[in-house]
Amino acid sequence: MKKIETSALIGLGALGILFGRKMPGVQVIADKARIARYSAEPVVCNGEECQFTYVAPEEGRPVDLLLVAVKATVLEQAIRDMAKFVGPDTVILSVLNGITSEEHIGAAYPGHTLWSVAIGMDATRTGRKLVFNQAGKIQFGERSGEMTARVQAVADYLDACGIANEPCSDILYKQWNKLMVNDGLNQAAAAFDQPYGGLRQPGEAQDMMRKAMQEVIQLANLEGVPLPPDNDVKFLDAMMPTFNPEGMPSMRQDVLAKRPTEVAEFAGVVRERAKKYGMPTPANDFFYTRIREIEAGYNK
């Protein structure tokens, strides 16, 4: 595996900005209308303007590393848009929420994808402005757990960029752990209209958040991924105090901006997979119904 030198990014939301701003020479894939919009109103991250190079899908050339940071709701379009940026040796990293994006990308570009997850950030995006305290890190690895040459090449590249990263031999465990977090935190913040600080207070939002997280732990165990029974408590005790109390996870940001949410990737996937085992998911049923109701009310 040769050294990674060229890179592209698709998706300039919170994660795309957080990581893309540190990738020298990264090409941001965007259609012409979006390029015009981005050029007219540049991204500002923690008060600093970010300078990106934009490239239309039809003008792409293969790159060494392609970072996919779109919302799950537009993944299929992104897969089409990045076609010309994928060459024989391109490595694809997807930092999408949920546990299914690598399967979708892998179906279109077999053999190119490393499994990955972005954790520990508390970024809040409003329009073209992003504010964060914690920049987070990318955990990644082969689905098989093997520490291959391309895993090392990606680690070397991210290190050189100054992006915190962790090559993993247990990436499926890490993905399910992140799903547990999103399933609780993201959905509770959206359904109960609460920032991080509100979720730290005892009450219905926190109760439902914990119940949803427990359902993910139970389902992960059924799927052969050994999340510990107290995994939710460990996360909440360790990480919640580090988050900006006024900040909020991405799903609440989507709801406030009246954007489609990723509820299908959280409660939707949990409910669907749980059916295989006859496992009830009352907390995720509640979140799925409530968030779909919120989305349905956007235009009323």
Q: Regions from the language model: what does each represent?
A:
Residues M1-F52:
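NAD(P)+-binding Rossmann beta1-loop-alpha1 motif at the extreme N-terminus of oxidoreductases
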Residues K2, R210-K300:
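NAD(P)-dependent Rossmann-like dehydrogenase/reductase catalytic/cofactor-binding core
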Residues E5-T6, P24-V26, D64-L66, P88-I92, ...:
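Short active-site oxyanion
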Residues S7, G25-Q27, G111-L114, N165:
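Hydrophobic anchor at the start of a short beta-strand
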Residues V28-D31, F140, R271:
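Short internal beta-strands
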Residues R34-S39, E102-E103, T148:
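Short, charged/polar "capping" segments at the starts of alpha-helices
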Residues C45-K129:
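Rossmann-like NAD(P)(H) cofactor-binding subdomain of soluble oxidoreductases
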Residues F85, A108-G111, K129-D230:
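Internal alpha-helical scaffold of NAD(P)-dependent oxidoreductase catalytic cores
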